Amino acid sequence: DFPLQDGKQAEFLELLGGALPDTRAFDGCLKVETFAEEDGKSVLLVEEWESKKHQETYFQWRVETGLVDALAPFVSGPPVTRYYEIRSE
């Protein structure tokens, strides 16, 4: 969940949208969905990975390649990352 600065959601989504094809092609990525809060104050990414290790390797790659720094001017605070286990009921 990325908290955003006022009026920055469209620009954030544009930059993020350009990066998502590489995310979806990254080893271990099964799915990524983007949700934009109606009031423009946040964007939520819901990702499914083969393992937590795959996601951590991907995130480190995004740090090294500069995407994390490129997103920084749009956010109002640190992103919130949560890990969930998919459960079948």
Q: Would you name each region that the model predicts?
A:
Residues 18-30, 48-82:
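An amphipathic, aromatic/His-enriched active-site/gating alpha helix that lines ligand/cofactor pockets
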